[in-house]
Amino acid sequence: MEDFVRQCFNPMIVELAEKAMKEYGEDPKIETNKFAAICTHLEVCFMYSDFHFIDERSESIIVESGDPNALLKHRFEIIEGRDRTMAWTVVNSICNTTGVEKPKFLPDLYDYKEDRFIEIGVTRREVHTYYLEKANKIKSEKTHIHIFSFTGEEMATKADYTLDEESRARIKTRLFTIRQEMASRGLWDSFRQSERGEETIEEKFEITGTMRRLADQSLPPNFSSLENFRAYVDGFEPNGCIEGKLSQMSKEVNARIEPFLKTTPRPLRLPDGPPCSQRSKFLLMDALKLSIEDPSHEGEGIPLYDAIRCMKTFFGWKEPNIVKPHEKGINPNYLLAWKQVLAELQDIENEEKIPKTKNMKKTSQLKWALGENMAPEKVDFEDCKDVSDLRQYDSDEPESRSLASWIQSEFNKACELTDSSWIELDEIGEDVAPIEHIASMRRNYFTAEVSHCRATEYIMKGVYINTALLNASCAAMDDFQLIPMISKCRTKEGRRKTNLYGFIIKGRSHLRNDTDVVNFVSMEFSLTDPRLEPHKWEKYCVLEIGDMLLRTAVGQVSRPIFLYVRTNGTSKIKMKWGMEMRRCLLQSLQQIESMIEAESSVKEKDMTKEFFENKSETWPIGESPKGVEEGSIGKVCRTLLAKSVFNNLYASAQLEGFSAESRKLLLITQALRDNLEPGTFDLGGLYEAIEECLINDPWVLLNASWFNSFLAHVLK
């Protein structure tokens, strides 16, 4: 058969057929009948188009050999025979210029006279059978179907045969000749029987061997075979009564579907108890910075040098005293730790050459604060498995805490603009493709909206602290290293600025596993008097360490400076996530981008510029007891960023659980709002799953209270 095909058909057609088969991973040497069928189909498409032109008056004419200079346009565009990408490009371009509906499958030809796509079929079976299969497959009124058989029969949509009698007769004669040539070589019977119907992918997909055995093993209960399960799934009416479906599925399931109405949901129950306390790894809105502008001192960029320079900008140090003790801690130790930091910084300055890092003396106060020698001694299991009363520590249930107003204030502050820029516009190479141009434009607009945002300051501060702490934990495992908490920014005028927030002292850090803990003591400057919201500072011992002159509208006022000291801990995995906080920028940019995409698809053009530059338009930001809060696009960017940053700063198991479970209730409620008549079963169980995550975490409690505002708003 292969030899016959190569002799019988034009070499160009043979080459196109080989290419088409290779594209689908088929071998012309093996699947010879298919090879012949593809060549035949290609030849019919070319003959269909041959000699048919449209003249200057848009009339259809037949020219077999004439003036090559006549202004003639081919009547048919040949799509069959091109590679897929090119073929779709041609189809798209035809649809765009003529307004014809885009077909779901690649057709064979386009008729410029009748303005329609044509599907050509060549069959070795009954033309009616083949016609119906084609029509069922393409399911389009718009594509014209024309079927030829090797016996001289034909069939076309609405009996409209498109071409004149003579052109069609040429095609039929050629097909008859091919059939006779095959028959004379004894190839026809095999060729005729090899034709299969138009298949859809699912019908062709046969599972055999191991996969078949796995499929049979993994069926739901009560199904004997894959066929039996398939038949059941095919007959499953999606909009029927759900209870019936559930009972069909399994004998054990007896869920009653309850309609979810406006009166169904209740607000989430937030826990009672003392107000929740601050648990972030560093101070947020309460932080105070000692800064130097245009740093140009020797060793600029070395953290310890920068820190000493920043400390020198302040002259109001005084004898420290405790103003808010830590309930459970040995407070004098915190006081001694700060005094030790001051003394050791003074020692560094008295040295000839300032070292690049500073390891603190292992004093009793630091050993206590860093939990040195506090870990219970580890004993090999072999040595103690015979102890009769061996048991795990009883661990106390976490104490419930109520929502406090400070966390909403923290969030509001994170959304605000500062007077410094915390990120530079990345230098990325020239845009090459149009999509890159749009991407750069979006990135630049977004960066402009968030570069001065306080949440961005928290990102850079978090990245710096976590990077420094992880470095020190690996490089100086046994040392109590002093790590300055530093950030860098640019002022409105574009001048560089280095800021010092305070110090961290790291404990022993032999971190083998991702979750092994390194303890640290943080000491951070602040102007916030802890006595105003003592519950927020439950975990801190707060000292008063100096007075600062502040310029105000009424002149200079002196305000006390506080030092917030606490023992804390982190792990390699937490530091890794802290170092990657810049991802929050990407996450919020993607959320904004999906808003732009939605807007663009409605308007059918890229709306990036309008989106950011139309200052009059307001967008929904969130729900509050007052209703839907709206704001400018910049405010939306900053709010989304702040949410992403707080998810990182306050990451916890409670947040994971709350986010996953409350999302289900959120989707049901949105379905109710959109009048989709949702139904639920075991709603009580869902509430239980959500509320078991509401224990004492400030960020989770705030999100739960926002969720209640959203519920109230939807159910109005």
UniProtKB/Swiss-Prot annotation:
Sequence motif: Nuclear localization signal 2 (NLS2), positions: 184-247
Cofactor note: Binds 2 manganese ions per subunit.
Species: Influenza A virus (strain A/Goose/Guangxi/345/2005 H5N1 genotype G)
Compartments, record wording: Host cytoplasm; Host nucleus
Manganese recorded as keyword: yes
EC number: 3.1.-.-
Top-level taxon in the UniProt lineage: Viruses
Gene3D superfamilies: Influenza RNA-dependent RNA polymerase subunit PA, endonuclease domain
Protein name: Polymerase acidic protein
Membership in a protein family: Belongs to the influenza viruses PA family.
InterPro entries hit by this protein: INFV_PA, PA/PA-X, PA/PA-X_sf
Gene: PA
PTM entry text: Phosphorylated on serines and threonines by host kinases, including human casein kinase II.
